[in-house]
């Protein structure tokens, strides 16, 4: 365990709070005009999946658990969960749907992800920053819309809704940011 200041806690970190391990879902630093700055952290308890919200002064010490980040390749999903393989050792691990959370929509066969492992147990998954998906449905462009900062709703092949520029039509492959589901660019493939 390593002690760190609360303001350095980031999404995906594993914290030891009162002897229990938690995965950080969100971490935000607030600096009110009056008073001391605080860090608001939403976490999920690893043992039972209970979500907890904590607020610490930014200078408070919290314990970060030792977690090994290892590259794994996504293989497939079945009734047990999501199967990943370590390309260096060919070891396979199964990650539960609860651990995956909303990120499972972006998984593609053969995709390389980073799994955070603590004592042999996968705790969290980090996807690539960008993924390429196909647009399956968009609304038609309204006449008179200009190209400047006007976006239209679109449905991606993984079922997630996003906003795309007016020149993007159904069937177009686009690059999407996995962190916030936002359009990045048209795919170059």
Swiss-Prot record:
UniProt keyword annotation of Protein biosynthesis present: yes
Gene3D superfamilies named in the record: 2.30.30.30, Nucleic acid-binding proteins (2.40.50.140)
Its job: Involved in peptide bond synthesis. Stimulates efficient translation and peptide-bond synthesis on native or reconstituted 70S ribosomes in vitro. Probably functions indirectly by altering the affinity of the ribosome for aminoacyl-tRNA, thus increasing their reactivity as acceptors for peptidyl transferase.
Alphabetical keyword list: Cytoplasm, Elongation factor, Protein biosynthesis
One GO CC annotation: cytoplasm
SMART domains in UniProt: EFP (SM01185), Elong-fact-P_C (SM00841)
Gene: efp
Organism expressing this protein natively: Rhizobium etli (strain ATCC 51251 / DSM 11541 / JCM 21823 / NBRC 15573 / CFN 42)
Pathway it works in: Protein biosynthesis; polypeptide chain elongation
Record protein name field: Elongation factor P
Lineage: Bacteria, Pseudomonadati, Pseudomonadota, Alphaproteobacteria, Hyphomicrobiales
Subcellular location, record wording: Cytoplasm
Family: Belongs to the elongation factor P family.
Gene Ontology BP annotations: peptide biosynthetic process
GO MF annotations, alphabetized: translation elongation factor activity
InterPro entries, A to Z: Elong-fact-P_C, NA-bd_OB-fold, Rib_uL2_dom2, Transl_elong_fac_P/YeiP, Transl_elong_KOW-like, Transl_elong_P/YeiP_cen, Transl_elong_P/YeiP_CS, Transl_elongation_fac_P
Coiled-coil positions: none
Domain of life (superkingdom): Bacteria
Cleaved signal peptide residues: none
NCBIfam families per record: efp, PRK00529.1
